[in-house]
Amino acid sequence: MWFLILFLALSLGRNDAAPPVQSRVVGGYNCEMNSQPWQVAVYYFGEYLCGGVLIDPSWVITAAHCATDNYQVWLGRNNLYEDEPFAQHRLVSQSFPHPGFNQDLIWNHTRQPGDDYSNDLMLLHLSQPADITDGVKVIDLPIEEPKVGSTCLASGWGSITPDGLELSDDLQCVNIDLLSNEKCVEAHKEEVTDLMLCAGEMDGGKDTCKGDSGGPLICNGVLQGITSWGFNPCGEPKKPGIYTKLIKFTPWIKEVMKENP
């Protein structure tokens, strides 16, 4: 599977952490500039960690398996290393991993049959609201269930090679299909629950990968999922990826945002 090597461990040279996911874009293309203005890059002490999504000027949603003790975010970026006119940097004042996510799984170096990575989402409260511009925009939470067969778009700066070792400087987009959860039940030894979405290409070649965790899954123009976990190597035939199903969590998200203005 996304061999449980937490992207944090990869980027910082640590070997004591291992997340359930390996999020990256394989088989994608360079996103058009400013086409994903809600895309966020989450950093840990200056090192790229995970993707995220701007759902409110003061709030970013990402994956709970990206949890650590220090965050900053970049908004409005296409290339992670070039000066860009729409880029905005923000510190994070508070983080709220979903209480139902089993953080102990992150520190396991091997994934076991039956491991359950449900509730893989986290809210980040920005210390200063984002300035909404042509290059930085919020995207609404879903209000209805996504339909199997929908065309979806995932994006991120994760690995562009199946082995997860070559990250992208430029934001990558990939078009994948929303599949029935039964397809992922057949594909993976870990638990696939109704709190997850299954998306990918059954023929392989297109997938998210290491480093894409926490980024958006947009189906028919609606934010429906957050990149969570998948098979390692990425993009294998009959091994679609797993995404947190946001429609299941909108009450919790709204409650956290309301209680922490």
Curated annotation (Swiss-Prot):
Tissue expression summary: High levels in pancreas, submaxillary and parotid glands, spleen, and kidney.
Listed name of the protein: Kallikrein-1
Pfam families linked: Trypsin
Organism per entry: Rattus norvegicus
Residue stretches making up the Peptidase S1 domain: 25-258
Segment forming the signal sequence: 1-18
Propeptide span(s): 19-24
Gene name linked to the record: Ngfg
Assigned protein family: Belongs to the peptidase S1 family. Kallikrein subfamily.
